[in-house]
Structures are given as structure tokens and as C-alpha cells.
Curated annotation (Swiss-Prot):
Residues that hold Zn(2+) according to the record: 174, 176, 187
CDD domains referenced in this protein's UniProt entry, alphabetically: MPN_DUF2466
Protein name (Swiss-Prot/TrEMBL): UPF0758 protein BcerKBAB4_4299
The keyword Metal-binding appears for this protein: yes
Domain MPN residues, every copy: 103-225
Record keywords, A-Z: Hydrolase, Metal-binding, Metalloprotease, Protease, Zinc
Motif JAMM motif in this chain: 174-187
Organism of this sequence: Bacillus mycoides (strain KBAB4) (Bacillus weihenstephanensis)
Gene Ontology molecular function: metal ion binding; metallopeptidase activity
SUPFAM superfamilies membership: JAB1/MPN domain, RuvA domain 2-like
Family to which the UniProt record says this protein belongs: Belongs to the UPF0758 family.
InterPro entries the record matches: MPN (IPR037518), RadC_JAB (IPR025657), RuvA_2-like (IPR010994), UPF0758 (IPR001405), UPF0758_CS (IPR020891), UPF0758_N (IPR046778)
Biological process (GO), any one: proteolysis
Amino acid sequence: MNGIRDVVREEQPRERLLLEGAGSLSNRELLAVLLRTGSKEETVLTLSDNILHHFDGLRMLKDATLEEMMSIHGVGIAKASQLMAAFELGRRMVRLEYQNRYSIRSPEDCASYMMEEMRFLQQEHFVCLYLNTKNQVIHRQTIFIGSLNTSIVHPREVFKEAFRRAAASIICLHNHPSGDPAPSREDIEVTKRLVECGRIIGIEVLDHIIIGDHKFVSLKEKGHI
């Protein structure tokens, strides 16, 4: 009996999941369950190891593109699609859980809400959180991807969604891929422009949070709002 359990433990992650629960599996074993099979040359666990090694663990894997996944020997379009779909479902479930109950009372609350999703992004993402009168998140929208400047961040795109969602206020966020959240001159100019537009139309811009590598800066706390 022990011999059978040893085989299950080493070679059959799905069976181990059924016996011991998903929480008992390692990252490589969970990945193997999603992949289902290996290739003619290697087992599914070896393929899992290769994927994790290629992406330096889960940190980079969660944001890998279809092409990046398919560049690994043994990963075709079917396996790459399965992984991307699983990761996206995970992100949506986390987002839904927070969105259904998350109230923002401070810059720390806002940074905690978005930190893990934004801190590892390789390009700048400008995101808006739309809040109701209780400061609860009712919607979030990525406005654009790319370097932040006043010619790209148009108030129309920011406030259009606020009207659609009947939002009472907005919090803006963007990340610095360098990991340093110190605001640039462009960051400050964009913020002031959006704050002024919000004041005119009656939808307050509460803050602009810059996300770095596990740290953040609030432009409101810095006196720019």
C-alpha cells in the first residue's frame, strides 16, 4: 500500500489531489494537473519543471503570453491556452471577491487592492477604480498601456466610464516597471489635469497611486491633489 502511495505521490499529481487535496500539491504538481499530459520525450512533471524554470517560477508565468508559453518544447497551442485560461479565471475570481466587498478608506487600501496585479507588469498600465458613495469599488478599467503623458491620458476616456457606472469618485493608478514609484513630472501633470476635469464635472478624483515593486506613492499624500 505504501509503495502505491509513493508512486501516486511522485508520478500522478491528479490522483494525489484526489487523495490529499489540492492544497497538498506543489506548484509543479498543480501545473501538471492543468497540463494533463507530457510529451513523448518527457513526463508531465518534467514539462512542469521546464515551464517553471523558464519563467523563474510563478512570478513571470502568470503574465506570460501565448507565444512565450509555446516557445517551450512540449507546449503547443492547446496546453498554452489551458494555462492562460486557468490563470485568467484565477485573476477574475480574486477580483470578484474583492470587488464585491472592498471599500477603500486610505491609500494603503487602494495599493493593497492592486499591488499584486500591477507590481510585475512589464509596461506601464493606467487603471481607474470607480467608486460609489460608500467608497466601494464598483468597476475597474485599464485606460491605456504605455508611457504616461498628457497627450495619451485623455480625460474623456477616464470619465466616460464613470458616467456609465454612475460612479461618485475615481482613483487612478499606474505602475512603474522599474519598481521605483517616485512620481515623474508627467505623472504630476496628468494628475492635476484629471483632478481639474473631475472638479468641473462633479466626479472627484480622490487619488493617483503609483505602484512600484511592493511599494507605492500616493500623489494625494504628496500634496499634488
